[in-house]
Amino acid sequence: MILCRGLFMAVIGIDLGTTNSCVAVMEGGDAKAIENSEGARTTPSIVAFTDSEVLVGDPAKRQATTNAKNTIYASKRLIGRRYQDTRDIKTSYDIVSAKNGDAWIKVRDKDYSPSQIGALILEKMKETAERHLGCKVEKAVITVPAYFDDAQRQATKDAGRIAGLDVIRIINEPTAAALAYGLNKSDKQKVIAVYDLGGGTFDVSILEIADGVFEVKSTNGDTMLGGEDFDHAIMEYLMDDFKKSTGIDLHSDAMAMQRIKEAAEKAKIELSSRMETDINLPFLSSDSTGPKHLSLKLTRATFENLVSDLVKRTIEPCKKALKDAGISADKIDEVVLVGGMTRVPKIIQTVKEFFGKEPHKGVNPDEVVAIGAAIQGGILAGDVRDVLLLDVTPLSLGIETLGGVFTPLIERNTTIPTKKSQVFSTAEDGQTAVTIKVFQGERKMANDNKLLGQFSLEGIPPAPRGMPQIEVTFDIDANGIVHVSAKDKASGKEQAIRIQSSGGLTDDEIQNMIKEAESKAEEDEKRKKFVEVKNNAENLVHSTEKSLKEHGDKISNADKLDIENAIRDLKDCISKDNIEDTDTMQNKLDHLMKVSMKLGEALYSNTNNATAGDNNTTDTGSSSNSDGSKVVDSDYQEIDKKDGK
């Protein structure tokens, strides 16, 4: 596949979502979401491992019930997180601790990082774009929740690298949505709030838009609040009801849990447009008395009662974002709803009550983030002009100082990219080395915040405590990724790192995963070829057997035996179902095609003979039929109307 011509065409925008993902591209000055191979503009963020292949998207979702243990969903909730922080997350698959303490996913006998799972979804998005554009894509802008910390942003970027993408920018989801909303409205100054409730995370951002400048004033959120939690609330309600009526606890039944999860998600969606919905799950379980079924009605009122605490949890971040921006709710000109969960009537009502105005519904909540990412790609490529995006860092960044105190160097909601330095000193006499521990968060004590990483500055000349001057510099790039350096002013000794947490993937691990992904791509292509050859072989066997049954009497016994042997050989090869036999199967298929041509030759020969028998005529010289009579060829002999000749 050729590389897309023109830089702007090669930059795609990807919304890597918890529940669904979407890819968009700039075309003719406008950004549009692209349909996948199944004809939908959103793709379920689900990956399934079967005995023979890896499935992504709708094919993975369709088989989830029968393969619950090996079907991975909502992996975005694990990306860049420590195992100890994910113990409350309930899934049908196994979450395990990696050697570095990160949360990984166990499938059969192998452990996968969430970045690897994310990479498989990104590969699907990449393929979708390439199929649409007709050329190879290498560059992408990928969105993340605004409240993602540095480790989660790094892990998302790693996923892009594993998928074979050059991630030229990481952009916050609410900011991307604001770009899509306000691209053609930026001539009018206004302040907007983007309320983004997706499948796994919640963000709220306050932005000021004027003269092509999109300036984020503040952002807040909750990376563990989203549609998955609403689904789980319904699931618990259904399982409690089932246990009361049958005495059976379904929590340890992976297949039943998967069926309940699918039913809960469907009910949640239906209750956005209906006042009640029926949930029927026959043969959900069984005991000594026979099969047990789940059947009940779920009303919108019951659903809203189940999720009321979850809805309330979105309000506190809204209050904090307004406070940090120095703006009251009544000064917000427009509230933009983003994420599939914002279709829920209770959410719409809550947003309306808090901000005192009807939310804006002019954007597609499922596609707007990817479209905004594509616009950002257009900006970076120079295809979209006169637009400036000023984003912020969501959390304060700083270091641990004497007594375990967290000392921020960059406060939250600081516009990025940014750089800031501060001078520190030693805590003990004669100290020749210092360890710099970098944290992100809002708590007063360092250990209550997220440790991003640490490094040491050595070779400091011995001196009384408080005498050495150590300059610590924080540099946050436009992706929100942190770089830190420390320099001893006296000796000139300096140590600089791009923050990589005590967890996270090393460059070697990423390179190995890239190689594995490339190898998987080769395996997938090999599997695809095998399936195509096998399908062709089965079709040929079927059609040849049918023809042999109907017309076998028209060929010699020797030819018939050759065809029967070729069919048997090809059937034996098909029954082995061995991908390594692809070339052998193709050869046997070719052989059957060759010998079965005898059937075709015999059929056409008989047809031609029959035709010749019916129409065997001559020109003016005439010819004899088997009975010796003369026949005149009507195609060549005109009949004289007068004498009838």
From Swiss-Prot:
GO MF terms, alphabetically ordered: ATP binding; ATP-dependent protein folding chaperone; unfolded protein binding
Pfam families: HSP70 (PF00012)
Feature: compositional bias, Basic and acidic residues: 630-645
Keywords: ATP-binding, Chaperone, Nucleotide-binding, Phosphoprotein, Stress response
Residues recorded as bearing Phosphothreonine in the entry: T201
Record PROSITE patterns: HSP70_1, HSP70_2, HSP70_3
Membrane-spanning residues: none
Disordered: annotated span: 606-645
Classification via InterPro entries: ATPase_NBD, Chaperone_DnaK, Heat_shock_70_CS, HSP70_C_sf, HSP70_peptide-bd_sf, Hsp_70_fam
Signals that turn on the gene: By stress conditions e.g. heat shock.
Stretches with biased composition (Low complexity): 606-629
Family: Belongs to the heat shock protein 70 family.
Chain's role: Acts as a chaperone.
HAMAP family, alphabetized: DnaK
Protein name: Chaperone protein DnaK
Organism the protein comes from: Ehrlichia ruminantium (strain Welgevonden)
UniProt lineage: Bacteria, Pseudomonadati, Pseudomonadota, Alphaproteobacteria, Rickettsiales
